[in-house]
């Protein structure tokens, strides 16, 4: 098996860190859903429901990012595909939010460029 490229290691670690933040956001959303049900925050229409669904969304997203990190770390082809898809979606989102999306375009463009280099694709077998 090929040795994992350093950039792939960095990306996998960044995906894990992002997943941790999503899980933290899920925990905060769950807490806010609880608070909304017992305080004046609950007077805002659908506040409790909003926070509950936000928590579910963040949990699912964190799980998918953690799975992607695993795929990147282990050199699985599906991990590469997930990373490419997420990066492409982020790039499109940044393009749609110009001019404030310039930093995202540069960073995500560089990541997408890196993921499509021959030695990286060979590591993933794609």
Swiss-Prot record:
Keyword set, alphabetical order: Cell membrane, Membrane, Transmembrane, Transmembrane helix
CC per GO annotation: plasma membrane
Subcellular location: Cell membrane
Transmembrane portions of the chain: 13-35, 50-72, 77-96, 101-115
Entry membrane topology: Multi-pass membrane protein
The keyword Thylakoid is assigned to this record: no
Key word Repeat present: no
Major subcellular location class: membrane
Domain of life: Archaea
Protein name in UniProt: Uncharacterized protein AF_0864
């Amino acid at each position: 098996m090929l040795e994992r490229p350093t950039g792939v290691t960095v990306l996998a670690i960044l995906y894990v860190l992002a997943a941790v933040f999503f899980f933290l956001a899920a925990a905060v959303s769950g807490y806010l859903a609880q608070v909304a049900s017992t305080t004046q925050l609950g007077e805002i229409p659908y506040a409790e429901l909003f926070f509950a669904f936000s928590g579910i969304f963040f949990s699912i997203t964190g799980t998918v990012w953690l799975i992607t990190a695993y795929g990147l770390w282990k050199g699985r082809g599906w991990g590469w595909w997930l990373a490419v898809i997420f990066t492409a979606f982020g790039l499109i989102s940044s393009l749609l939010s110009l001019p404030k999306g310039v930093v995202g375009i540069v960073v995500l463009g560089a990541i997408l460029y890196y993921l499509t280099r021959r030695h990286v694709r060979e590591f993933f077998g794609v």
